[in-house]
From Swiss-Prot:
GO cellular component, one term: cytoplasm
Similarity-based family: Belongs to the E3 ubiquitin-protein ligase UBR1-like family.
Keywords: Coiled coil, Membrane, Metal-binding, Phosphoprotein, Transferase, Transmembrane, Transmembrane helix, Ubl conjugation pathway, Zinc, Zinc-finger
Residues carrying Phosphoserine: 343-344, 1199
Enzyme Commission designation: 2.3.2.27
Location of the protein in the cell: Membrane
Zinc finger (UBR-type): 118-189
Lineage: superkingdom: Eukaryota
Top-level taxonomy: Eukaryota, Metazoa, Chordata, Craniata, Vertebrata
Disordered: annotated segments: 1-24, 339-362, 1008-1028, 1164-1186
Protein name: E3 ubiquitin-protein ligase UBR3
Pfam families registered for this protein in UniProt: PRT6_C, UBR1-like_wing, zf-UBR
Amino acid composition bias (Basic and acidic residues), ranges on this chain: 1170-1186
Transmembrane spans: 761-781, 919-939, 1806-1826
Organism in which the protein naturally occurs: Homo sapiens
Amino acid sequence: MAAAAAAAVGGQQPSQPELPAPGLALDKAATAAHLKAALSRPDNRAGAEELQALLERVLSAERPLAAAAGGEDAAAAGGGGGPGAAEEEALEWCKCLLAGGGGYDEFCAAVRAYDPAALCGLVWTANFVAYRCRTCGISPCMSLCAECFHQGDHTGHDFNMFRSQAGGACDCGDSNVMRESGFCKRHQIKSSSNIPCVPKDLLMMSEFVLPRFIFCLIQYLREGYNEPAADGPSEKDLNKVLQLLEPQISFLEDLTKMGGAMRSVLTQVLTNQQNYKDLTSGLGENACVKKSHEKYLIALKSSGLTYPEDKLVYGVQEPSAGTSSLAVQGFIGATGTLGQVDSSDEDDQDGSQGLGKRKRVKLSSGTKDQSIMDVLKHKSFLEELLFWTIKYEFPQKMVTFLLNMLPDQEYKVAFTKTFVQHYAFIMKTLKKSHESDTMSNRIVHISVQLFSNEELARQVTEECQLLDIMVTVLLYMMESCLIKSELQDEENSLHVVVNCGEALLKNNTYWPLVSDFINILSHQSVAKRFLEDHGLLVTWMNFVSFFQGMNLNKRELNEHVEFESQTYYAAFAAELEACAQPMWGLLSHCKVRETQEYTRNVVRYCLEALQDWFDAINFVDEPAPNQVTFHLPLHRYYAMFLSKAVKCQELDLDSVLPDQEMLMKLMIHPLQIQASLAEIHSNMWVRNGLQIKGQAMTYVQSHFCNSMIDPDIYLLQVCASRLDPDYFISSVFERFKVVDLLTMASQHQNTVLDAEHERSMLEGALTFLVILLSLRLHLGMSDDEILRAEMVAQLCMNDRTHSSLLDLIPENPNPKSGIIPGSYSFESVLSAVADFKAPVFEPGGSMQQGMYTPKAEVWDQEFDPVMVILRTVYRRDVQSAMDRYTAFLKQSGKFPGNPWPPYKKRTSLHPSYKGLMRLLHCKTLHIVLFTLLYKILMDHQNLSEHVLCMVLYLIELGLENSAEEESDEEASVGGPERCHDSWFPGSNLVSNMRHFINYVRVRVPETAPEVKRDSPASTSSDNLGSLQNSGTAQVFSLVAERRKKFQEIINRSSSEANQVVRPKTSSKWSAPGSAPQLTTAILEIKESILSLLIKLHHKLSGKQNSYYPPWLDDIEILIQPEIPKYSHGDGITAVERILLKAASQSRMNKRIIEEICRKVTPPVPPKKVTAAEKKTLDKEERRQKARERQQKLLAEFASRQKSFMETAMDVDSPENDIPMEITTAEPQVSEAVYDCVICGQSGPSSEDRPTGLVVLLQASSVLGQCRDNVEPKKLPISEEEQIYPWDTCAAVHDVRLSLLQRYFKDSSCLLAVSIGWEGGVYVQTCGHTLHIDCHKSYMESLRNDQVLQGFSVDKGEFTCPLCRQFANSVLPCYPGSNVENNPWQRPSNKSIQDLIKEVEELQGRPGAFPSETNLSKEMESVMKDIKNTTQKKYRDYSKTPGSPDNDFLFMYSVARTNLELELIHRGGNLCSGGASTAGKRSCLNQLFHVLALHMRLYSIDSEYNPWRKLTQLEEMNPQLGYEEQQPEVPILYHDVTSLLLIQILMMPQPLRKDHFTCIVKVLFTLLYTQALAALSVKCSEEDRSAWKHAGALKKSTCDAEKSYEVLLSFVISELFKGKLYHEEGTQECAMVNPIAWSPESMEKCLQDFCLPFLRITSLLQHHLFGEDLPSCQEEEEFSVLASCLGLLPTFYQTEHPFISASCLDWPVPAFDIITQWCFEIKSFTERHAEQGKALLIQESKWKLPHLLQLPENYNTIFQYYHRKTCSVCTKVPKDPAVCLVCGTFVCLKGLCCKQQSYCECVLHSQNCGAGTGIFLLINASVIIIIRGHRFCLWGSVYLDAHGEEDRDLRRGKPLYICKERYKVLEQQWISHTFDHINKRWGPHYNGL
């Protein structure tokens, strides 16, 4: 195949090719068919030439690219159609030729049929949603596209969804990367076997055409590239070229999608070297090709690359066998030799930008391996295509094309080799790039596909020197930013380190290369080669040494540092990524004994590098003062490989350890870090700014600790186990600068430390020793034990969520390590140590996540304070752990007081490290412990409980780890006399404890109290002699001792002896000049450690002789010292535990303890009170008095606040609470009294100084969401499911009003209904009152307050001054009586007729607006507020704009909205009765006054007042009918509840109870008639005639007016007169309920119709007259409410079944008034029977509103909505969201849907919820609430298996609905409490 193509392409072309005839040219298909036929012949030479000629002409690169390069003149140059036309033409030709004359689509389909789809290979770009299954993955980078994932079976697997950061490709079907069990259905079958062979002629044309096409593309790329000018590459120009090439590259991409057959043709074309050579060499006559070749050479040269003319250069093409090609050439000396300082570095583009302060250093030695860095020779299209891809900085389209080809195995290998060949060039381009982030992502997008495959990585390692190339490229990259190290010896240092301020490090530019390196090291075969290759190891250690000592900190001693550098981020990231992670990768392959050699290699080169480093920094024996670097990667490599060698490979530790001198050097810098940590925490580095604290915290933080502090501590443990213990201990105290403090004298002088820092530095030193001696992470703990200890430590600090635990537990950074998140061991350990606390919703509104908390037995046995201290980033966490421990002990009754940290037994030491315990048994430590115990007992300054705690801990550690029991013969009497060399006779702590020390000589300032004392008379010369020899000039000269040891060791190596000099720096440490002279004093001590401990027991317990040896009562206790009694407790317990252990280990100790206890301690004389103490006592007294005063004040304040508390406790749920009284009136006072929460005065509200209620007005559409179905609607999760809002309460009321407005007079329609179902105004209060003038000044002060508030004062918003509840208005309280004591309430005995007349008369009186008072002004302003709360469209329903009827309708509808909402808050009925908090905290009474006052300004003309129609018979004129244009709305079509509100609000306030009852009675008659009419319409023709006759017979009975049968029969016969029933067709009957109507079902139907009215009326009565609501069963609700409203006659007998008709009380004869009402309908139904019927049936049975029902699994929502397109722009929105009220899909922040500066969510919240919107953000799983101009994040209702939210789907674990949370969300929506419960609101500026 390839040969044929080559023949066609190659050879000298005739200079004037024969072009096809013009006719053929026009008909592309015919030409293509002709050529295909010609080429199919055995002799296809002519055909081939003809095709070539055609392609020459069609694919000539000259035309379009003149345009591309020409920029502005593009249009002119491109000829007629511009560049686009020519290119389109060329593409059309190509498609035709490929198809060989057939249709291109058919051709594509034909090729697809031959696709052996064994691999998916789908390529995606950044932000694509993919899946990763750790159960199925072999490589940690494995990923699957959504389709393959869902079609495979991953149930129960450890998978997660993720958003791709850099792009990726689907690995389904690739068994190198994942297990076959995880393949999806499509890729499971190895289907290649049943795919037929590709017919030769199908792809024949492709083989001829594609080489030319690709060459043409390459020519475009050559032409279009212009070397960027000096000012940096002009990405604009490059992008322009790429845009022009978009169609061509897309065409290639489409070809790859045709499947395997086409991919293999493309592979042949791309990798065929002959094709490439013939077409691109530029040797032919074609001028265009020549020019293009020149441009290519220029581009190569400008890239700093040489083009070897076919010579084999440096053996790149043929790698030599054996060691790597770089061997050890120039690398070893690299650190040592520094070249000249070169500022004109080719790569130095930002050298001028602020980095000039520190000169860059260039290494002079030949670190560059020319062959790797500078040579590129392209031999195929693929190679040159990749070159241009890199040159153009990895355009997305090109990357996708190159990756789409990867399923072809041959291509994959070729491409990987090409990629490796270009690796150095990639690095250079990356360094220069201005878009390094994007470029990095694209590089990794490619490399992760290549290097994750172990087989492929191994192949390129062997054939292309992959490791050499990577290491060299990394080294070369870092060389460009080296500076001279200032560590230790600034002037003479020869060491170079990376400069962390350089862009390369600051922007993490190196990460793609490092990440590739880590990726290939994860393959065993590759890592093995690396560990075997000495040259590579040397180079790598060289690379690591660039980071050794970087980011050096120098302590500021005088001024605060001017500029806080943030370079430490870069430094920590670099060490972790570039040094530690490759280290973990290598370690993971050193797990077994067989790999010992690898470890030896690494350790060897590591030590060499360390030795070079010590030489380069000129290190002798002392670290330079006031310097610290946290970066010692060489030390850490060494430590980690040592640890691995002992733990896994059974290597003998000593065989890999250096000599003593090297060990001494090795410990210096890690120890310096530990001391610096203590200094930083002691605030000694405070002048260096916050960043130094940041470094100290990062060093121990969970992602870094096991690569930093853990290896450091381990290395120190190793050094301590092998060095002289006295030397080590003294080094520690010297490093921590507390040597001077360790004196028996009460005063001392510290030359290196300020007094204020001494205590914390001493604590630091002791804590460090405790950690060093207790920690077993690398000294023998198994992985599971480590995991358990880590987990316990984290859980003890705080309860943790599962994800934060995963994050906090130091994970082996290498992804292939054993313990991975979610792994079996993690989960099993977690369930063993912790209990799960399910997520709860707390009353304050804060949502808890699912948490893990330590089990009781963990607190009891496993709490390890040492581990906690090691792992805390913040010091407060240690305290938190102790507080929780204390709480546990109190709760479980184990210890009541304040406990000390418990002593925890340690796992046994690995034998290799036994030497570590010598530290506990060395005299130096014993002297320190003795001294500190003595000082604590003597109350010397700067000692704390913490110091004592650590001292006791060390003693106990020593006892636990003491040598075998000492022999009793060991003489212990007369010890002091014989012991001349030191304080203590031996080194065993057990025996040293009982050793008495009599005298000590100390150096003290002359002012010290000790100096005055005479020396003891009894001192014998012998004793003095012993003192002089005992080296106690000051306690013991730690420093001198250390110096001596170091000197000895150094003198051994005589060659260096002459270099040993005291470091120059020591002069800085001389004591301040003003220091008082020191003098020697001798102290009488006469104590042993045991005696000090016993005295300490007395001191701690505050009692003399408090210690009684427990074994005197129970000798058993000595054999079994582990007694639970001693495991928890305070200092006293600790001392007792130690004494018991000391006694049980030695009979001598036991005897001495008993002796000491027998000596009765003399009683202590009473203390004299000194002046200072008196001062303290006075202070105490004063404090006590102040406390009492405060208590008194608080009590006063508390009573004031009591009412508030009762309110505040219950914001979200309106039930279950203590009622909250708005007023504080006494029962006998008739006038209501209010407290002002601002000025604190109480009094009535008056016209001049009105009081008001703090209220929040908000528009609400909750009522409109009610449906007649109990089941909430489901959120649509497929295209088929849709939600149509026809059945909502709002829609039904809308339809009804428009229907009325179509046929009846507008002004009358506006009185027949209520509005406010959508956008109604809801008023709520917290119940607090204030003077309105106080409120105004309060608002003024808020306006001037500059603090950022979560509300807008300009919009009238504020928070209640007392309870801080959100509010935006004040509702004036009407002066007058208290509701409960209303004089108008008393019943009168007037007849109903009299009352009806009174009502009419009162309504007729015009309501004069009260005189201009403050109160009336406030009433008016609050009315304005209420109107402005909702949008105009929700309050303007009149056909004539601005009609007063509109205002009238709006006002009584406000009352309706509030009553209806209260009913919903009570659960939709009044069965529970009582005054629920909602009732007590209601402001309906005050609201009614405001509304009534305004409504009485509109008088209804008595002609039109519905009251008349209800209570009087009028003359019926049958001729009237339809004379006037639009009649009034018939009274039977009126909404009775609206009528009720109109009647009541038209009355003068306050209303009399009997008038209220009268109105209710009259309206009930109308309501009942409506119920009967509705019933008659609902039933069938037969039922109607049956009822008509049955009722007619009873009409003459006495109580006919109260019999529903009679009334129903009468209504049917009246309505029959119109055409109401006549229209029923057959389909109507089918719809009718087929139920048989029994008297019970009819009664129920009538009651159900009337109940909503009764409920609202009862609520209204409750608010107006303060009457309590009775509670009842649901079935008796009607009768209870009816009697409560006075509808039932008092003598009504309850034993009969209840009949609703018995509530009727007709003001005029029933049959007459019914006739009158029906007559109004008759004339209307004669013309519009259909509408007439619809208006009679009023749907009144609304169920409670609900949010949409959500699916169980979040993935269901996500998969449907995250790909759903926006209906406006048809693109997939960046932030899709869905409304949980109505299910609308919206674009959050989407500009496509923006209307008049409002984004879609804000707009939707206004249309759907009148300003309240509840949206689920699809890509974040979070709910966002919009309320007016503010918004807040509410949280998530979807939680994972561990009860946690996953905001932004970062973890991508499966999420499940949390029904409790969703219920809470719904409750807050219904109760309108979002504003009160959620605290974090911010303005959205209409941008959501």
